Amino acid sequence: MTRLTRVAHRAPMRLLPMQPPGVAAAGAAACALGSYGGGLLGGDVVDLHVSAECGAVLALTTQASTKIYKAKADGVPTQQRLTAKVAAGALLVVAPDPLVPFAQSAYVGLQRYALEPGASLVAVDWVGSGRVSSGERWAHSSFSTRTELSWAAAGGGSAASPGSGGVAAGGGSAAAVGGDGAAAGSADAATGGGAAEASRPWLVEAVQLVGGPGSELAFDLGETRRDAYATVVLVGSQAAPVVSRFYSAAAALALRRMRSAGGMRGAAAAPPPDTR
């Protein structure tokens, strides 16, 4: 059974411990990430630190899409940073709703994951095209996001001191702290402090989307409307079922597209990759 052992946050971020029936039945812990007002203003900085201890299963979600509001006159972007340490045997799932960048918004995101040997990760980083119902499609000024994965030494310590918020999950009794910066600092002290010992990233994925009126994603997706972009990272044995489902879905979509384009018919899908 996994329990949240430390939770701390301060504006503009909110962390809401949750325990849906399915999560509880799986012996996992869950926490919803949110913000006051349902979105982030230009110049807001969110700095989240997460630690999943040995054998823990932690899910980080949101209750709705996060709006990225129009940048202020100075053009300073909205920033979100996530630093996570996943211990051996632990599974961290980061599955938020998509970001929704408003027209003339500016956003910079950074996700850093340090995994001990035997750790598993399912992480989704995705963005919608904006307020489509209001006629905004990819009308943001700038949008960039970067994901880094690195190996961490076993027992290398907890994630670094939280800025806007921090979450730790492990065994034992649950404890939660929240409120201002002092509370956030005490949460880190209780989990052991110190930065995660990580090597240089072995995987880096970076995306920059330049928006504006009439912009479209420059990907050939056939006749599919391109209203979202996503990066999905799947690592470790506990992520293997998700890998198989993604592979099956991708193969089915590719086959459907080939058939609709008058290409190969009755093509057989290749066997799924080895996820060991």
Segments the model singles out, each with a brief description of its role:
Residues 2-6, 27-33, 57-61, 94, ...:
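Short, well-ordered strand-loop elements centered on a beta-strand within folded domains, enriched
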Residues 16, 34, 51, 61, ...:
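Residues in well-ordered beta-strands of folded domains
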Residues 78-138, 143, 147-148:
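Internal, conserved structured core segments that host functional sites
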Residues 2-3, 14-16, 189-193, 219:
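Intrinsically disordered, low-complexity boundary segments flanking structured domains
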Residues 70, 127-155, 192-276:
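A structural signal for small-residue-enriched, beta-sheet-centric alpha/beta enzyme cores
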Residues 152-199:
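Intrinsically disordered, low-complexity terminal tails and inter-domain linkers enriched
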Residues 1-98, 103-107:
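N-terminal, charged/glycine-rich beta-strand/loop interface patches
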Residues 52-55, 87-88, 116-118, 151-154, ...:
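Short acidic-glycine loop/turn motifs at beta-strand connectors
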